[in-house]
From Swiss-Prot:
Signal peptide: none annotated. There is a cross-link at K500, K881, K1021, K1024 (Glycyl lysine isopeptide (Lys-Gly) (interchain with G-Cter in SUMO2)). Residues 1-15, 1015-1031 have a biased composition (Low complexity). The lineage of its organism: Eukaryota, Metazoa, Chordata, Craniata, Vertebrata. Residues 342-351, 872-887, 992-1014 have a biased composition (Polar residues). This is SAFB-like transcription modulator. The modification N6-acetyllysine is found at K401, K1021. When overexpressed, acts as a general inhibitor of transcription that eventually leads to apoptosis. Disulfide bonds: none annotated. The modification Phosphoserine is found at residues 93, 97, 139, 144, 289, 421, 549-550, 552, 747, 786, 797, 812, 906, 920, 995, 999, 1011, 1016, 1018. Its main location: nucleus. The modification Omega-N-methylarginine is found at R1014.
């Protein structure tokens, strides 16, 4: 391994380009290639390999093979970071030739990681070693300009280192006594450091493992570790104590890095050659001691006096350290990949990258020197300590004792863990009885499984404390190598933030710290090596480390992390003195190469790189600040927008509610108006209906009134017309009637006054009637007296009896017989009609033979008549006797009249009879020929169902005065008036004072002459068996 690495380094030194398979590249090489192509460098190795292959394919190259340009100036300066300050001193001597290319790449990766860590570490170092700062810087300048100056700086560094050793020795004892306190302090520091790392700008660097956050506690832990290591360097007794102290310091660092960082920080802290002898530095020394040794060899040419010796001594140690580092890296990579080993994302990545670079570019020379130095130390000291990493949290010391007891005698076993963070990785230190057993245990138990976890078993080379520290460093380096795989992704998460912070601080402080650390390392080496050559080498290494650290904040971070590494280099130097001489030859051969590399190296570019890193860090910080401000503004704007949106939504909701309320109000108003409108319409309809009803009622009333008026007018018209027809007819008959006598006229005079109200004015017309005029009618003179007597008697008897009005209102079918035979009633008293028709005939036949009744002419009449009316007026007897007989008979018949409806019958008959018949029935003689004429002239065969006949008056004006009806004041007119008088008294008949003079015939005429309806104002009243009523 070492030879191959040496060959690789040699080829790299000789040729700028080196062909390798991508799969064989270290993570740091992969990242450097990716960064050179401006690609993402975060992720595990597999991701980086695939990314790089893709980039190469895009470029048109071979994705499987790649040519790496390895400049001799790219020393494993990153490994110095992971290794620690003392180891950096070694690397400065050994890595000078190889630093340029790989270091540039490493620096770029470390820029993000180291600034923050270096800042805190530098602050501590400045406080602790402020007085050495100027000397260290001066020594760096001397190294870069003149070798003499370098020697002077070395002397100064020795003086400073002596003083520091004294301080460390005093503190070492306290640290041993207060291991627990230191451990707790480291834990506290770790928590604070984690917080700071989290708060950091996250550059992606891997040196988060520095105990920067807790500057106080971590500084104390680091100081204690450094002092312990330096004390251990002065004496082996202190070495044992320093082992525990170193473990504690490592644990503190590890605590800072959540367990995974323990390994990385330890590795980073223990990378220097002198650190290889120290417990913490052992791991880093194993991984990076070749670089430091190579740097030492490069320094040796400058200080050939004692540097060669130191390099000779350091070579075997460095070889062993290199081999162990390779083993640890390979084993830890596997272990960490499987386990996610304890290597911290930050420091492990840096240590790993630095160790890988040192291995790849100058691993051959560095590993040779590192193996000669560290391995030489381990062989010289016959390493009996074993460093076990990757233990599960439930592993106990007894478990380790049992496990390692299978391969030899176990003197002691110790388990270290981080109590602050649950689930953190545990580490073990096992002390075997002999180095052969150690080798056996490493051979059999490395990369085996214990309690379900893959453990890594490494030797601790050098003094017991140095061996343990070396084991830790180896394990850390291995964990770094394995952690590089893991931390490729972890770096982007944890270490980036912390490293950004640290970069700021460490950029300036790293130079001072590294210078101090290098001085300490040089002192330790001088003390350990004794020969001035070794001290000069350590001085050169320390100075070179200072330069490297100043150039690369990553290295500074490593030195800062392991302040106790200053002691470790001294121990390592002592260890190299004892065991490094065996490898002086190898170192001598490598010195030349390193000298070339160192010559090629340029120190100024590191300064520039440091400034560039600082600027980049500032830019990143500014960018981060801008991003935070932008995010804050964005959040504020978002909040304002949400608030505006909320207000808008609230307003919209309120507006909707207001509109809804308004709509509801309008709806209610509309409904109200609708109800009012409907009510108005209903009232209007009601009003219209009432008006229509009223109008209809008014029309109905108007129609009824009109009808009534029309009926009355018609009635009046009919009556007047009938009267107008009757008067001329009656007048004419009277004039020609031989049977009319004064008696009849007298009797009619009394009735004429009451027949028509309009004729009452003519009452006096008949009062002056002289009975002497009767002489003109000698035939009727005797009859007149008898008639008067009978009429007088009858008028008294009938006039007293009021005629009931009900009889007149009987229906027409009762008062108007259908035939003559039916109208006769078979009551005990013979009907009046029969009496009148038979008796009258007999009487008349007896009294007057002159009058013959012609019965055969009756059928010619159009209207049926009552049998009484059909009988012609019998010849009036001239004798009193006959007259008396007839009057007696009539009186008898009239007395019986109320008992039957003869009155109504006769009335009906009279009414139903046509006017022609009426005239004949009146007893005006045998004027049947004229009767027909009158009937024809009158209403002509027309009957009136209303029980009245409208008599048309030909050539007569109804409106004319009534006196026109009466004609001249003679018997005719007087008789006519008397005859009509009874009709005017139909409703309330009266017997006039002349009723006694009325003859039976005249009475009959009066009865039968009433053709007008009852209650009428004109016409004859119906025949009744009694005289007309008296008013």
């Amino acid at each position: 391994m070492a030879a191959a690495a040496g060959a690789v380094v040699a080829s790299a030194a000789s040729g700028p380009a080196e062909g390798k398979k991508i799969t064989e590249l270290r993570v740091i090489d992969l990242r450097s290639e990716l960064k050179r192509r401006n690609l993402d460098i975060n992720g595990v190795k597999t991701v980086l390999v695939s990314r790089l292959k893709q980039a190469i394919e895009e470029e048109g190259g071979d994705p499987d093979n790649i040519e790496l340009t390895v400049s001799t100036d790219t020393p494993n300066k990153k490994p110095t970071k992971g290794k620690g300050k003392k180891q950096e001193a070694d690397e400065l001597s050994g890595d000078a030739s190889v630093e340029d290319d790989s270091f540039v790449k490493d620096c770029e990766l470390e820029n993000q990681e180291t600034h923050d860590q270096d800042g805190n570490e530098e602050l501590k170092d400045l406080e602790e070693f402020g007085e050495n700062e100027e000397e260290i810087v001066h020594s760096q300048e001397l190294l870069s300009t003149e070798e003499n100056k370098t020697t002077q700086e070395f002397v100064e560094a020795e003086a400073i280192e002596d003083r520091e050793k004294e301080d460390i020795e005093s503190q070492e004892t306290e640290a041993q006594e207060g291991e627990d306190d230191t451990f707790l302090t480291a834990q506290d520091g770790e928590e604070e450091e984690n917080e700071k790392d989290i708060a950091g700008s996250g550059d992606g660097t891997q040196e988060v493992s520095k105990p920067l956050p807790s500057e106080g506690s971590l500084a104390e832990a680091d100081h204690t570790a450094h002092e312990e290591m330096e004390a251990n360097a002065t004496g082996k007794e202190a070495e044992d104590d320093n082992i525990s102290v170193t473990i504690q310091a490592e644990d503190a660092i590890t605590l800072d890095f959540d367990g995974d960082d323990l390994l990385e920080t330890g590795k980073n802290v223990k990378i220097t050659d002198s650190e290889a002898s120290k417990p913490k530095d052992v791991q880093d020394a194993i991984a990076q001691s070749p670089e430091k040794e190579a740097k030492d060899y490069e320094m040796n040419p400058n200080h050939k006096d004692g540097k060669k010796e130191d390099s000779v001594k350091g070579e075997p140690v460095e070889k062993e350290a290199r081999e162990s580092a390779k083993k640890a890296e390979s084993g830890d990579k596997e272990k960490d990949t499987l386990k996610k080993g304890p290597s911290s994302t930050g420091a492990s990545g840096q240590a790993k990258s630095s160790s890988k670079e040192s291995k790849d570019s100058k691993t051959s020379s560095k590993d040779d020197k590192g193996s000669t130095g560290s391995a030489g130390g381990s062989s010289g000291s016959s390493t009996k300590n074993i460093w076990v990493s990757g233990l599960s949290s439930n592993t106990k010391a007894a478990d380790l004792k049992n496990l390692f007891g299978k391969y030899g005698k176990v003197l002691s076993a110790k388990v270290v863990t981080n109590a602050r963070s649950p689930g953190a990785k545990c580490y073990g230190i096992v002390t075997m009885s002999s180095s052969t057993e150690v080798s056996r245990c490493v051979a059999h138990l490395h990369r085996t499984e214990l309690h379900g976890q893959l453990i890594s078993v490494e030797k601790v080379k050098g003094d017991p404390s140095k061996k343990e520290m070396k084991k830790e460093n180896d394990e850390k380096s291995s964990s770094r190598s394995a952690g590089d795989k893991k931390n490729a992704s972890d770096r982007s998460a944890k270490t980036q933030a912390s490293i950004k912070k640290e970069e700021k601080r460490s950029s300036e402080k790293s130079e001072k710290k590294e210078s101090k650390d290098t001085k300490k390392i040089e002192k330790d080496e001088k003390n350990d090596d004794g020969p001035s050559g070794q001290t000069s080498e350590s001085l050169k290494k320390s100075e070179e480390k200072k330069r490297i650290s100043s150039k690369s904040p990553g290295h500074m971070v490593i030195l800062n992390q392991t302040k106790g590494d200053h002691c470790r280099p001294s121990r390592r130097g002592r260890y190299e003195k004892g065991h490094g001489r065996s490898k002086e030859k190898e170192r001598a051969s490598l010195d030349k190469k390193r000298d070339k590399d160192y010559r090629r190296k340029e120190i100024l570019p590191f300064e520039k790189m440091k400034e560039q890193r600082l600027r980049e860090h500032l830019v990143r910080f500014e960018r981060l600040k801008q991003a935070v401000e932008f995010r804050r503004r964005k959040e504020i704007a978002e909040r304002e927008r949400r608030e505006r949106e909320r207000i808008r939504i609230i307003r919209e909701r309120e507006e909707r509610e207001r509109l809804q309320r308004e709509r509801e109000r309008l709806e209610i108003e509309r409904q109200k108006l609708e109800r009012e409108r409907m009510e108005r319409e209903r009232l209007e309809r009601e009003r219209i209906r009432i008006e229509q009803e009223r109008r209809r009622e008014a029309e109905r009333i108007a129609r009824e009134r009109e009808e009534l008026r029309r009926q009355q007018q018609q009635l009046r018209y009919e009556q007047e017309k009938r009267n107008s027809l009757k008067r001329p007819r009656d007048v004419d008959h009277r004039r020609d009637d031989p049977y009319w006598s004064e008696n009849k006229k007298l009797s009619l005079d009394t009735e004429a006054r009451f027949g028509h109200g309009s004729d009452y004015r003519q009452q006096s017309r008949f009062l002056d009637f002289s009975h002497r005029e009767r002489a003109r009618f000698p035939d009727t003179a005797s009859v007149q007296s008898s008639f008067e007597r009978r009429e007088r008697f009858v008028g008294q008897s009938e006039g007293k009896k009021p005629r009931p009005a009900a009889r007149r209102e009987e229906p027409s079918f009762e008062r108007y017989p259908k035939n003559f035979s039916d109208s006769r009633r078979n009551e005990p008293p013979p009907p009046r009609n029969e009496l009148r028709e038979t008796d009258r005939r007999e009487v008349r036949g007896e009294r007057d033979e002159r009058r013959t009744v012609i019965l055969h002419d009756r059928p010619e009449v159009a209207h049926p008549r009552h049998p009484r009316e059909t009988v012609p007026n019998p010849s009036r007897p001239t004798s009193w006797k006959s007259e008396a007989n007839m009057s007696t008979e009539k009186r008898e018949s009239r007395v019986e009249r109320p008992e039957r409806s003869g009155r109504e019958v006769s009335g009906h008959t009279v009414r139903g009879a046509p006017p022609g018949n009426r005239s004949s029935a009146s007893g005006y003689g045998t004027r049947e020929g004229e009767r027909g004429v009158i009937a024809d002239r009158g209403s002509g065969t027309q009957h009136y169902p209303e029980e009245r006949h409208v008599v048309e008056r030909h050539g007569r004006d109804t409106s004319g005065p009534r006196k026109e009806w009466h004609g001249p004041p003679s018997q005719g007119p007087s008789y006519h008036d008397t005859r009509r008088m009874g009709d005017g008294r139909a409703g309330a008949g009266m017997i006039t004072q002349h009723s006694s003079t009325a003859s039976p015939v005249n009475r009959i005429v009066q009865m039968s002459g009433n053709s007008l309806p009852r209650g009428s104002s004109s016409g004859f009243k119906p025949f009744k068996s009694g005289p007309p009523r008296r008013f």
